[in-house]
């Protein structure tokens, strides 16, 4: 799928939108909660992907594109909500905050790559359902009700599982020496 990007073919963006457009839009929409901002973010994601390939050769492409969308949506979200906080995205971030620090930002305390590797290793220890729930909540920023429907369970069950997963994550990070 990255070949058209290397050839600088105009079809690259069309194919990207066809194959991964829904996922990109969902990531942006879950963070921004606004169709106009979502559409702008999706278009910026396509442009960012066009600029990033080449030189990057992402595999898998979907993860690469969703990461660009997530970063752009997060920046736009923070710009839009500098004064007000309370969306489900803030709630999801606040849930994870206790796993990482005592008020300092993650960037101040840890090398992002090391933390990312540790979280990926932790996720590999989880069963499929827990990994799915954690990823849908903290990567895709899905609302709890949507996750419950996708996992064929109750919202309360998802909430309890996320709490237990966060506790396991805290213990894992302490064991790995990344959290004191």
Stretches with model-predicted labels:
Residues 1-23, 30, 107, 140, ...:
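N-terminal module of bacterial RNA polymerase sigma factors
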Residues 12-15, 23, 27, 37, ...:
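Amphipathic alpha-helical recognition patches that constitute DNA-binding helices
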Residues 16-35, 50-52, 123, 175:
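Amphipathic, Lys/Arg- and hydrophobic-enriched alpha-helical face
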Residues 40-47, 51, 59-71:
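Structural recognition of an alpha-helix C-terminal capping motif at a helix-to-coil junction
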Residues 67-89, 112, 175:
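Arg/Lys-rich amphipathic alpha helix in sigma70-family domain 2
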Residues 74, 119, 130, 139, ...:
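DNA-recognition helix of helix-turn-helix
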Residues 94-124:
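Acidic, proline/glycine-rich intrinsically disordered inter-domain spacer in sigma factors
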Residues 133-134:
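Short alpha-helical "packing" element that flanks the helix-turn-helix/winged-helix DNA-binding module
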């Amino acid at each position: 799928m990255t070949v058209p990007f290397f050839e600088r073919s105009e079809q690259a963006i069309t194919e990207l939108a066809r194959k991964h457009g829904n996922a990109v839009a969902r990531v942006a929409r879950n963070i921004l909660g606004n169709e106009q901002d979502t559409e702008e973010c999706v278009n910026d994601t396509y442009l960012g992907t066009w600029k990033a390939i080449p030189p990057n050769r992402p595999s898998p492409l979907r993860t690469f594109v969703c990461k660009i969308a997530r970063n752009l949506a997060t920046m736009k979200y923070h710009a839009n909500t500098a004064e007000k906080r309370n969306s489900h995205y803030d709630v999801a971030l606040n849930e994870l905050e206790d796993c990482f620090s005592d008020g300092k930002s993650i960037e101040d305390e840890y090398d992002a790559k090391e933390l990312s590797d540790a979280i990926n290793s932790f996720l590999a220890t989880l069963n499929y359902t827990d990994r799915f729930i954690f990823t849908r909540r903290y990567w895709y920023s899905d609302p709890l009700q949507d996750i419950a429907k996708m996992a064929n369970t109750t919202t309360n069950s998802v909430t309890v599982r996320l709490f237990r997963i966060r506790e396991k994550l805290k213990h894992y990070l302490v064991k790995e020496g990344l959290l004191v």
